[in-house]
Amino acid sequence: MSAEQLRAVLAAARRGAKESFGVDVEFTQPEEQPLKALFDRATPDERSDWSDLSYDFKRGKGDRKRLARGYAAAFRSDENSLDDQIAFAEPYLLAPVREKTYDGFAEAVTATLIARLDQLKSQKLSDGGELLDGSPSNEVLYWALIGKLSFPYDVVITNQLIASAEYVGSSVHTAIRGGITNGITTGNPFSPRGVTAIVSTYPVTGEDGVTRALRGGESYSEADSARYAGLLLVHEIGHQLYDLGHAYGKNACVMNPPAMLRFREWAERLSPADCRPR
């Protein structure tokens, strides 16, 4: 995104935070940071630990059963019911839920996750480079554990695709997209608030075939891309400032994650006045 688009993202986030949470949010002047230099701060021990927790889809050497167990555990601990999680995910699964248990649901989600990750790893960037290369920049854990890297920012906006699978499990809406993460909110003792909200703009702007298909075949204008990225930041601010969970199925609420990457449909259904408790 250009500097002008980034300003539009932050303006959309300010408006959205006011509408959804009644809070006035201000952002400092953005600073650009090289991603490689940031992740190079990880120690060899940290890299080894994070690698052990990650499913190695790039080399096809992951433990699928362990992955499914991790997702079953994550779904059990989710504040949403099993029925609500299944209802949210089922239209987008590539494998059937053979039994409506946490284990049965996790099997279907894991099959979908792996299939879509396999599709993603064959995609190219517009310059012909690999969408997912040998670096760890796409790995969720490197972002989720950014607080270990002496990173003093409350908000991060990146154009890097974040897509991976971890044995510790993740939310269902991320898994069914092939591990694509729109955003992460994570503890960070080096940031002013002690929590960093991270948004990836790649799901909104990326033009590889898989990402575009997950958007329903759409490519967005610069103005729409900035608006949708701003709303994704509002979603993360809900996690960051208010510790809000995911409001699966509550289409009026910004805390209901986008289905797949269909950001236009998601944004058009938002109605903060209809979301607030009465």
What are these regions (language model features)?
Residues M1-E4:
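Short beta-strand segments enriched in small/hydrophobic residues
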Residues P203-T205, T211-R278:
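The catalytic-center signature of Zn2+-dependent metalloproteases
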Residues R15, E19, W143, P257:
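Charged/polar, solvent-exposed surface patches and flexible loops
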Residues R7-T28, E32:
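Domain-scale, conserved, charged regions that form catalytic cores
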Residues G22-D24, V195, N251-A252:
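A generic structural signal for alpha->beta connector loops
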